[in-house]
Amino acid sequence: MPQKTSDTPMMRQYMEIKNQYPDAFLFYRIGDFYELFYDDAVKGSQLLELTLTARSKNADDPIPMCGVPHHAAQNYIDILVDQGYKVAICEQMEDPRTAKGMVKREVIQLVTPGTTTDKSAEDAKENNYLTAVNFDSKTKKYGFAYTDLSTGELKVAILDDFDSVINEAVGLQTKEIVTDESLAESFEERFKELNILVSKQSEVEISAELSYLIQDLTSSTEIEVVKQLLTYVQTTQKRNLAHIQKAVAYEPSFFLRMDHASKYNLELTRLIRTGKKQGTLLWLLDETKTAMGGRLLKQWLDRPLIRKKEIISRQDRVQVLVDHFFERSNLQEELTKVYDLERLAGRVAFGSVNGRDLIQLKTSLLQIPKVRHILEELSEPVFDDALEHLDPVSDIAELIQNAIDEDAPISVTDGDIIKDGYHAKLDEYRDAMRNGKKWIADLQAQERATTGIKTLKIGYNKVFGYYIEVTRANLANIPEGRYERKQTLTNAERFITPELKEKERIILEAEQKSTDLEYQLFKEIRELIKKQIERLQDLAKQVAELDVLQSFAVVSEKYQFVKPTMTKNHAIEIKDGRHPVVEKVMGHQSYVPNNIDMDDNTDILLITGPNMSGKSTYMRQLALTVIMAQMGCFVAASEATLPIFDQIFTRIGAADDLISGQSTFMVEMQEANRALKDGTSNSLVLFDEIGRGTATYDGMALAQSIIEFIHQNVHAKTLFSTHYHELTELDQSLEHLKNVHVGAVEQNGNLVFLHKMEDGPADKSYGIHVAKLAGMPDKLLKRASVILEKLEAKDQAHSDGVETPVSKATPVESEQTPTMIEEQMALFETPTKPVKSSPKEEVANQLEQLNLMDMTPMEVMNQLYKWQKKLRK
């Protein structure tokens, strides 16, 4: 009976290893390739666009297979991991040429979305966080820990509820979360809805080498979740983790808190529409020059400060850098030459660092004395702490300078990595190699002269070693018996001589010894650097902080931001405030600034005005101003006085949660409820059009109730925009509410947005005018105008002589009267066709009615630009 293809020793070995990693693609090393078999091959060929073939094609049970070259494997692994898959890398643990029987193979690493460390250059400013969560049944709290294996960062927190877990995980943009059996299945499903891979780690046991990482933790909840995280890391990585830093406990309430919906709505790091960084607040603020500075900026954006002393400390350092342009420019220039110290230290620990990495490390360290000199020149006390901690790690820089060749290759096992003069024995081997190769060159010249064959050459390959090659046309010129024939080619013959083979032995022996010694020396150097990883990580933190501060200074000067005054009272006073991102996109000249004035007696601004007039921008503008101020950055205004907020809640936009089947209205109510439940008098609440997702009266009733609840119970500073104009009467009964509106005027039937916030309620919503700006057909717009007039007339008929407070909604008629039927039919009458003015007539009419004395020069210029654009069309 023939043997099944799956019953060979190699395939039995494959299945044994695969069964240990059932949820991962197994990259199984065979020679120079990683092979995938069975379902891995079928699915992998589709995801990686590889040709699907088969092992033992002609057998009754051929095995599906595909493969990738080992030198290109990382790209394919990245593709799979980026799509949320795990990859188990199975290596040959012995040389197939010397192995007795089946080659021993082992999985040396399990690469997962949360543990991948080989980040591309475009991801250099992104952290890749692996998180862990468990539920402590005794305290009824959640343990939450995270690490970035590429940088060694390790942090832990105790969270009150699962919503807080979600907020932390989404804020970190984690791709993988490690759980145990304590977490409810429904919670795991929530992670999956957010495209977070859930990995199980039930057994918890960390090695003695890592136990020191938890020695500063006091809570059992913190200790257990960190151990859970580290156990998973140990199990999957199977590598040295010397660069992992001691676990640091943090308290989310020590920072300005924003739930994931608020961060999403405010587009802090990703645009809602495109998912890209460009057009976000992070994009605007990022003038960092180093990868670790870029990552720290994002961390500061995710967690602005709430302690006034810390905020002022950052502001003061930014002010110094704003005031010293030349020193700041020099600092930027030096930081540009600093590579990613955090990830270089990580590669040293992992043992994956190469010669080029060490040259980058040396180059970076050599910039630190120059950075110190710039700070010393500033001679400002606010930078004394930075100077104290900017350790240039000069001993490591000197070691690399003396040992590693500037042109070191990527490979660490093929030689040419250690400098001449670093090690005497290595120099001896190299001299032997160089003398031998000179002897080869001399022999080639000698043989050409002796034989008269000018094309004779001496070459080398790994199969035959050194050889003498002569073309067929010149074979007759070789003296009889001079060479020993070794290989026949199509157009040439290759020969050897005893003397050549002896010299080959000497050269190759020297080469092998040289290469082996170089690798040994490189490993010794790597171990010396590994002992200084903590110093390198501390230095990286100092450089990153300097980088973010100079970035704040650059954008503050470039966009004319001002240093905000942070107060302990609750008043907000912003003069000429701007939305910094919108201003950058539009250009400074065309942006209309706005004031925001909410004294201690004003808790709620009720905002009315047309669609597209800038209500949402005005609200986001305040949120971004608060976030920037509490990050320590300057803000987009001419003056700003702000309280320190503890939380920001937003409901802006109508992004349905389609994945979990929740409607716009349900999401709206949930997001509003978070503010009502968790908000305090120190919070900022931004509600845009609450209630629009349901019937008119329902929406209006809910909107009013929410406003009243905030006014009477929460007392948070609140911006509440609405189309329910009836709500503007609330200022009569709610003493801490103030009406404002976005100005707009009609000119010859056209709507002109002033984009200026004015006191009092808006008189109209101008919906049809906005539809006109959107390009809807004239016929439709005219019809809408007729319908609107009829509806307004009907509403007036019902309300004439009767006071209708917001709290008493007008009842709906249960029966239709003949008059009402006639009114409804009239809505569908064919309207008369309007006479449309020419662009020149429209401009002339607008110019005639313009009051130039009430306009600023900039407003006049903007109006002229609009007219010119219209006439050119």
UniProtKB/Swiss-Prot annotation:
CDD domains, A to Z: ABC_MutS1
UniProt keyword Membrane present: no
Pfam families with a match to the protein in the record: MutS_I (PF01624), MutS_II (PF05188), MutS_III (PF05192), MutS_IV (PF05190), MutS_V (PF00488)
Binding site for ATP: 609-616
Annotated InterPro entries: DNA_mismatch_repair_MutS, DNA_mismatch_repair_MutS-lik_N, DNA_mismatch_repair_MutS/MSH, DNA_mismatch_repair_MutS_C, DNA_mismatch_repair_MutS_clamp, DNA_mismatch_repair_MutS_core, DNA_mismatch_repair_MutS_N, DNA_mismatch_repair_MutS_sf
Gene Ontology cellular component annotations, sorted alphabetically: cytosol
Alphabetically ordered keywords of this record: ATP-binding, DNA damage, DNA repair, DNA-binding, Nucleotide-binding
GO terms, molecular function: ATP binding; ATP-dependent DNA damage sensor activity; damaged DNA binding; mismatched DNA binding
A GO BP entry: mismatch repair
Region (Disordered): 797-817
Keyword DNA damage: yes
Function field: This protein is involved in the repair of mismatches in DNA. It is possible that it carries out the mismatch recognition step. This protein has a weak ATPase activity.
PANTHER family found in the cross-reference section: DNA MISMATCH REPAIR PROTEIN MSH1, MITOCHONDRIAL, DNA MISMATCH REPAIR PROTEIN MUTS FAMILY MEMBER
Assigned protein family: Belongs to the DNA mismatch repair MutS family.
Record-given protein name: DNA mismatch repair protein MutS
